[in-house]
Amino acid sequence: MKAKLLVLLCTFTATYADTICIGYHANNSTDTVDTVLEKNVTVTHSVNLLEDSHNGKLCLLKGIAPLQLGNCSVAGWILGNPECESLISKESWSYIVETPNPENGTCYPGYFADYEELREQLSSVSSFERFEIFPKESSWPNHTVTGVSASCSHNGKSSFYRNLLWLTEKNGLYPNLSKSYVNNKEKEVLVLWGVHHPSNIGVQRAIYHTENAYVSVVSSHYSRRFTPEIAKRPKVRDQEGRINYYWTLLEPGDTIIFEANGNLIAPWYAFALSRGFESGIITSNAPMNECDAKCQTPQGAINSSLPFQNVHPVTIGECPKYVRSAKLRMVTGLRNIPSIQSRGLFGAIAGFIEGGWTGMIDGWYGYHHQNEQGSGYAADQKSTQNAINGITNKVNSVIEKMNTQFTAVGKEFNKLERRMENLNKKVDDGFLDIWTYNAELLVLLENERTLDFHDSNVKNLYEKVKSQLKNNAKEIGNGCFEFYHKCNNECMESVKNGTYDYPKYSEESKLNREKIDGVKLESMGVYQILAIYSTVASSLVLLVSLGAISFWMCSNGSLQCRICI
């Protein structure tokens, strides 16, 4: 019996066994990503795809300065408001900056026809050539060309637009006029003019000497006849009269003809336009700085190569796509679940089931071994490098596909087009929602695939070791194997590099396996003997207890015993 109890004790004092575990890298990263199935998954490595910062300044765009309109609007600049005279010399720019409420627009009150469309056209212009379409001194010999207005004063004196001429009577006459221009610039030419609408017939007679005036403007793509509307109007900038402003684009080789017998605000300067796909008009109060950037928004410049941004939907230059997302992070590493570094019954550190290894720093997947010569970590470089290459290519591919750099300028609508503007906003919002949904779904799917890819790689590494060891070792859980034979460092290395010699260790493993199986059988016999002894002893104790209770009850009369024959 003593011998059997000794065998039982031996089963609880198992001898040391060599082990090898398959696991993965872990670190102290707090990066979190979302997947299709989970949110806020902590991972070892990830890349951000969403730019959410800007410098708060207006910058040069690829070394080219913007055109800052200052206190002038686009209308004041292009018509030549005297207060915008400093802008006349500006002929090239990277983009145009207009403040939210500029003071200097049309100095003489009136309606600017198709102004929003003109802004849209100018938003794609990066430079122009300003030239005299009808020279002031020679084009109108029979008319006075010095018409001015107090509403367009400059330096305290009455003045007028720098790109238009107000033609009035000369020597008491206003002869019919006819003037034409042929576009020989090999570019589109922007031509602007106006029609004066006096407040009463007396002003009409005094300036133009006719009550039935007209203005006709004709080109291959434009034809319109204007009749002055003489009426008293509320004063604006101390003026009861109005000037309505018009424009057209003249194609190369085309001719524009002006005919009038009064009320014409004639073109003086026109503009040969050069288009630039990265130009645009933004409305901003941001300060100008000497910085240089590739992407500009009204809030500030963005210097980023990321595919998405949530700074502002209006952008100029090579800019990330605007989305409404608050977070777009793509996983490149593994789930970050550092294992509790405690040792189990066999001294093995938890493997890929319970968590990763912070001690393995030179790879994503690998091994931890323990034998008589010590213990240590080793990364599986081949599987790690293959994974890095695959994920890097995938991330680069996603960024390349989604990183469509472009300019997104705001669309222009006048006050009478609110329904169209609201409809446009709904359409834009719809597209923006689709873009945001597509971007978020893409990241969620790729994150799910990447984490599954890592899990698959760890499993494949585990199966690789298992197929080599076969029955020379046993699986003990947590991604670990316990050898049935001694496995020194050379042996461990052969398992890691796939050259493990199974036949070399099979005989030793067989003997040790049989010994362990014998101990198990002997232990089972001991358990059976103990079970029998325990049952018999328990029964005897129960019988003695019942007899004692019966004797006590009979002695005090609580229990009567009768024997009938």
From Swiss-Prot:
Signal peptide range: 1-17
One of the protein's GO biological processes: fusion of virus membrane with host plasma membrane
Transmembrane segments: 529-549
Chain ranges on the Cytoplasmic side, renumbered to this chain: 550-565
Major location category of this protein: virion
Intracellular or extracellular location(s): Virion membrane; Host apical cell membrane
Disulfide bonds: C21-C480, C59-C291, C72-C84, C107-C152, C295-C319, C487-C491
Keyword field contains Transmembrane: yes
Known role: Binds to sialic acid-containing receptors on the cell surface, bringing about the attachment of the virus particle to the cell. This attachment induces virion internalization either through clathrin-dependent endocytosis or through clathrin- and caveolin-independent pathway. Plays a major role in the determination of host range restriction and virulence. Class I viral fusion protein. Responsible for penetration of the virus into the cell cytoplasm by mediating the fusion of the membrane of the endocytosed virus particle with the endosomal membrane.
Subunit comment: Homotrimer of disulfide-linked HA1-HA2. Interacts with human CACNA1C.
Miscellaneous note of the record: Major glycoprotein, comprises over 80% of the envelope proteins present in virus particle.
Family: Belongs to the influenza viruses hemagglutinin family.
UniProt-recorded name of the protein: Hemagglutinin
Phylogenetic lineage: Viruses, Riboviria, Orthornavirae, Negarnaviricota, Polyploviricotina
